[in-house]
């Protein structure tokens, strides 16, 4: 890889369905398979739109312990005009063939349940093979709008 750090900037991601979860996963075979084992942690800070409550906590249902499924980086995103999401994912040394590949993300979204969420995810791809492709998707339906940008950081 050209850079030791890559930053994915996701802006105004909107979806066709309510209550979806944007996800990502890496590949070590140029995108033929997206199933690299990863260990992750996930927590959320949130505030209800009607000011009735707040939330903050570790979400055990969104972390992985050597899981090979796609990792969520936003939770329960809605499809309404005021329910898009934006955020950043950092990936470190994906071309390394010596070390595991660390990442972290922060994603802001408004949910179908009218909760503004600040989503934090961190972890690592447990492989010493180079990560040579990243896939972004949602768990149901289609992404209908938004911009995904990739920046290399020296």
Residue ranges and their predicted role:
Residues 1-154:
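Surface-exposed molecular-recognition determinants
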């Amino acid at each position: 890889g050209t850079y030791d750090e890559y930053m994915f900037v996701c802006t105004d991601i909107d979806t066709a369905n309510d209550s979806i979860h944007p996800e990502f996963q890496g590949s070590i075979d140029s995108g033929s398979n997206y199933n690299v084992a990863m260990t992750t942690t996930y927590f959320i800070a949130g505030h209800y739109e009607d000011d009735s409550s707040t939330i903050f906590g570790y979400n055990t249902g969104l972390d992985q312990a050597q899981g090979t499924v796609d990792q969520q980086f936003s939770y329960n995103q809605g499809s309404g005009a005021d329910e898009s999401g934006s955020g950043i994912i950092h990936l470190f040394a994906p071309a390394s063939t010596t070390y595991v590949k660390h990442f972290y993300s922060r994603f802001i979204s408004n949910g179908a349940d009218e909760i503004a969420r600040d989503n934090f995810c961190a972890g690592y791809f447990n492989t010493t093979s180079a990560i040579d492709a990243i896939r972004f998707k949602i768990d149901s339906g289609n992404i209908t709008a938004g911009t995904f940008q990739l920046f290399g950081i020296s």
